[in-house]
Amino acid sequence: MKAWLDEFNGFYRAEATEDEAIDAYARTHVGFTSIHPFYDGNGRLARLLSNLPVLFAGYPPIVIPVESRQDYLQALWDYERGNTDLSAFKSFVRTCWQTTLDLVAEAR
């Protein structure tokens, strides 16, 4: 738990690039789901906590759309089953985030 908290606290950087923000989101998310003791609620709380470094860096939140739920769960299951390469999960997160970034750009 201490190691996860130390890593999580290290993600708070106001000058983070988009790639660094996605990396922080992904690492926070998979790290939290691996230590969180309850089966139900892991995802909701993990998505909330994972957005904190993203928001701190000045970016809009990463939102996982309901229609992408199966892809989201598959990416997490792949990681939990031993595929410790986060590139697939980060790619999924980037795709979801791009939708949010596009909405923000349209609103301006």
Regions found by a protein language model. Give the residues of each.
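Hydrophobic (often cysteine-bearing) scaffold residues that line and stabilize catalytic clefts
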Residues: A21-A24, N42-A46, F89
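C-terminal end-helix/capping segment
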Residues: S50-W77
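Cytochrome P450 heme-iron axial ligand motif
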Residues: G31-G58
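Generic alpha-helical secondary structure signal
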Residues: A3, A24-R27, L48, E67, ...
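General structural signal for alpha-helix termini and helix-helix connectors
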Residues: G10-A14, Y59, D78-G82
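Helix-hairpin-helix/helix-loop-helix acidic hairpins
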Residues: M1-P37
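Acidic, carboxylate-rich catalytic segments that either coordinate divalent cations
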Residues: S68-Q70, Q74-R108
